[in-house]
Amino acid sequence: MLLQTDQGSVMPRDGSVTRNKIMDVAQNMVLDVGLSGTSVEKVIGEAGVTKSTFFYHFKTKHDLAASLIERYAENDRHHYSDAMEKAEQLARDPLQQLLIFVGLFIEMTDKLEEPFPGCLYASYCYQSGAISADIMSNIKEMMHFWRQRLCEKIDAIVALNPPRIPIENYQVADHLLTTFEGAFILSKVMNEPGLASQQLIQCRNYIELLFAPVP
């Protein structure tokens, strides 16, 4: 993420430039060393701001953590909606729409030269004891967002293309979500940038085979 020049003790009119800079630094740090390894002092030093500037925007580390997940979730919603909207513009059939949707993420991950930096949801969940119930609730809400939206698409697919084996639609939606999240984690652990796209290809193959016409 791009970091802007520190404004020092002089705040922008809305403070958004400095606030976003602090959040960008903090998010990269959380993805790198985890929430427990991210201290206010380290964020201040990396962002090049004063303590007074930091606490002008965030009262506590918890306040910063909550703001990070709120921004991350909002971007996630837009990312999902933009990708699905594009898929729906390219095809009328729900099955093709879902295959294109997954394909857009395959295209994105296939361009990675380094493993995906990680998922903020996962980073927080691994240290759930260090964050509030409200933050965990926000993460759970986003998991339900993905599940519900994907399940709606799978419902539409099933109505036109009976699956070749018995399924619970929400479980297929969860499988998609699990593959998306797990592929990025595995790619980072194995230090193999191409692994994420490979797993998403397998996921797309599964969906295609699941709803293929019976000979």
Per-region residue spans from a language model:
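N-terminal intrinsically disordered/low-complexity leader segments
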Residues: M1-V17, V158, P213-P215
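Amphipathic, non-transmembrane alpha-helical scaffold segments
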Residues: G15, M23, I69, A73, ...
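Helix-turn-helix
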Residues: K21, V25, M29-R71
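Hydrophobic alpha-helical connector segments
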Residues: S67, D82-F116, N169-L176
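Amphipathic alpha-helical packing segments from all-alpha helical-bundle domains
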Residues: R77-H78, Q96-G103, F116, S132-A159, ...
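Amphipathic C-terminal alpha-helical segment
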Residues: M108, L112, L176-G194, E208-P215
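Amphipathic alpha-helical segments used for helix-helix packing
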Residues: L112-D134
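Hydrophobic alpha-helical segments that form the core
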Residues: P117-G118, A122-S123, I167-L186, Q202-Y206
